[in-house]
């Protein structure tokens, strides 16, 4: 009714050289596949962490395309931004960027447990929980691998680092104070809230849901 074409597409279906995108638009009988021109506005629904996707975003922006969602800045930058808000900072668990494993040891002197989270991760992948037994000094850790819970222990930080190298790899990580998590029927849950600006430029809650862990 507005004389505009809306279509969905994968970032891998964009041909910049030809100025064509293979995508799908919704018609009276369902989804229709077709070739479309480079649009004026794109609302990205994917997480553009990979180098190829970031390059595609930059190329589209260089053509004058408006992308409504900026790329995610990562957990560490997000934490620093939230810490600048005096109304929020008291609600944030202590968080440090892991420059070396001694940072984890320092955190465990103050708290019963910590979480290690990849700076550029999502959907709970490669997150590690670490605790330290006060009496023995033994470190215990848990993480998910291919839908299976891996549990282990280490006698010192050097052995802990060696044990976690498989899951952590060369990724940048933050270490965060363990907090008490909400549970439903034994599963951890968290609440996701979608906030968008309305037609007047004011922020409005447009969606809310609970994510239940496995």
Regions found by a protein language model. Give the residues of each.
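Short, surface-exposed linear patches
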Residues: 28-31, 63-67, 89-91, 117-120, ...
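Phosphate-binding site of ATP-dependent enzymes
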Residues: 108-113, 120-128, 132-214
């Amino acid at each position: 009714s507005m004389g505009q074409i809306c279509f969905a597409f994968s970032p891998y279906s964009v041909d910049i050289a030809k100025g064509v995108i293979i995508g799908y638009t919704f018609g009276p009988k369902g989804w229709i596949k077709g070739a479309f021109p480079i649009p004026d506005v794109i609302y990205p629904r994917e997480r553009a962490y990979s180098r190829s996707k970031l390059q595609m975003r930059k190329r589209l922006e260089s053509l004058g395309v408006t992308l409504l969602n900026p790329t995610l800045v990562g957990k560490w930058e997000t934490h620093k931004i939230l810490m600048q808000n005096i109304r929020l900072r008291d609600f944030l668990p202590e968080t440090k960027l892991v420059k070396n494993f001694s940072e984890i040891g320092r955190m465990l002197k103050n708290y019963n447990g910590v979480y290690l989270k990849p700076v550029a991760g999502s959907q709970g992948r490669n997150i590690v929980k670490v605790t330290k037994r006060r009496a023995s000094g033994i470190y215990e850790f848990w993480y998910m691998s291919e839908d299976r819970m891996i549990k282990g222990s280490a006698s010192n930080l050097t052995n802990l680092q060696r044990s976690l190298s498989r899951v952590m790899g060369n990724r940048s990580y933050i270490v965060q104070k363990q907090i008490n998590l909400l549970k439903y029927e034994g599963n951890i849950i968290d609440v996701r809230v979608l906030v968008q600006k309305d037609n007047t430029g004011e922020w409005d809650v447009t969606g809310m849901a609970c994510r239940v862990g496995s």
